[in-house]
Amino acid sequence: MSDGEEDQTAIVCDNGSGLVKSGFAGDDAPRAVFPSIVGRPRHQGVMVGMGQKDSYVGDEAQSKRGILTLKYPIEHGIITNWDDMEKIWHHTMYNELRVAPEEHPTLLTEAPHNPKANREKMTQIMFETFNVPAMYVAIQAVLSLYASGRTTGIVMDAGDGVSHNVPIYEGYALPHAIARLDLAGRDLTDYLMKILTERGYSFVTTAEREIVRDIKEKLCYVALDFEQEMATAASSTSLEKSYELPDGQVITIGNERFRCPETLFQPSFIGMESAGIHETTYNSIMKCDIDIRKDLYANNVLSGGTTMYPGIADRMQKEITALAPSTMKIKIIAPPERKYSVWIGGSILASLSTFQQMWISKQEYDEAGPSIVHRKCF
């Protein structure tokens, strides 16, 4: 970068499947956090001059959800609708952060084992549509480790679209041992919709799914012992909680509170053949060199919104202790700000002086094209 660009703060944008977290490098929290949603009206507008738009993004889409069809352009961490994604980035830059993207280097994030075309297209849109001076794509779990102040550990990052385990030793990610699981918050929301329907509460539309997501975030928790908790729920009403729907109707939920997140440990609940998050973590550690496993066991870092359930750290501790050698010291680190730790790590990374030579500049992009991203970003 030339001297004239030093005063430009980098933008950090963690575009998750469920929430976009964006802000400026060096800040300790994101300025803007809004749902990664684009909504389109599902009815004909009849009142003239109301300035009705053909699409709404983020919080505005959320507040008008009763008349909109909501779509998430990112599914399982992969961008599936680029036009809508451009709308989201446009909204982030111009409406939320109120910056001119051509003046700020931009750090984006993605899940590991994403299709190569995904980050190439991200790079292309940043340089060609938004004309950013420089950009970089970082792996989400690696940023979470930065945020926790460690250089060694295994990160279990679970968001809305994808969960992944990334073992990192002395700052090096170990790509052969990365485990990715396409089971995350959105699948849990869908499962909760299903089991609430069995109780006689019907949730079907894209807008009602948002209500269920709110129920999930407010009332769900992870049981330490699932069978025992089921027995408790069956024999008493002590675990029941009530929730008021937007129309004033009150619903009661009992064992659904912990049956929903239990799916993380037993994916067979939603018909997936995969191992649970405790097993993927263990398998990931076992794929690493025998000499570094001890350090990974002692530094299990949780990150992402789907690790926010009460009880999840204790349950992880219990499950991994059962799998690991009996003498092994196991520590689960669950930082309170872990919902945003990917963003915080990005903010730290983008403001390091040593990182400044890592950016992909506009000039490099013009010379090499979108594939430059595989050479310059891990």
Curated annotation (Swiss-Prot):
It comes from the Eukaryota. The keyword Metal-binding does not apply. GO terms for molecular function: ATP binding; hydrolase activity. InterPro entries: Actin, Actin/actin-like_CS, Actin_CS, ATPase_NBD. It catalyses: ATP + H2O = ADP + phosphate + H(+). Pfam families: Actin. Belongs to the actin family. This is Actin, muscle. It comes from Styela clava. The lineage of its organism: Eukaryota, Metazoa, Chordata, Tunicata, Ascidiacea.
